């Protein structure tokens, strides 16, 4: 049995490791078409694992940390609006996934994130940042979300299915 401090340290360590992995998966293994809002990456996966292991607070902090650190690797300053959108995504994953794993939860969670975070929240940020038209931004963000949605569900569901038992033993 772990003490409360040991439990918090374990969850913090898992979240920090997942934030670092998210930076690698997003900034170094991801693809972002120059001059467009298209982005294909699997940086969400470590955050979803942190959400399963530690819950909404830790996954939100991990996603925000990964976004801020990752922005420096991309050569620009962090955007607080994008970082807050990532925090919201982390919270949603933490609420849906904390110690719970099912396909319906993955579908619902990633669908909410796709519609509300990726399209409705991030689109105005891209319009403001890059002076893109609303139509172009919403269209491309919607296409991006529709392409990423099944990929994210599939990757998350089967990855967690593969690591769930050892992860549960660790926790």
Predicted regions and their residues:
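Loop-helix junctions at membrane interfaces
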Residues: 1-171
């Amino acid at each position: 049995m772990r003490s409360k401090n040991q439990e918090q340290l374990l969850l913090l360590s898992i979240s920090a490791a997942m934030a670092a992995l998210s930076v690698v998966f997003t900034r170094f293994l991801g693809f972002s078409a120059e001059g467009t809002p298209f982005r294909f990456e699997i940086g969400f996966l470590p955050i979803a694992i942190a959400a399963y292991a530690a819950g909404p607070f830790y996954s939100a902090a991990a996603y925000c940390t990964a976004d801020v650190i990752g922005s420096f690797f991309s050569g620009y300053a962090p955007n607080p609006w994008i970082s807050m959108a990532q925090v919201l995504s982390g919270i949603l994953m933490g609420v849906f996934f904390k110690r719970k794993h099912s396909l319906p939860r993955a579908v619902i969670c990633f669908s909410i994130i796709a519609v509300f975070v990726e399209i409705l929240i991030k689109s105005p940020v891209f319009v403001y940042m890059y002076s893109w038209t609303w139509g172009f931004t919403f269209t491309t963000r919607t296409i991006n979300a529709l392409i990423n949605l099944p990929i994210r569900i599939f990757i998350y569901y089967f990855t967690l299915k593969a690591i769930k038992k050892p992860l549960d033993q660790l926790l």
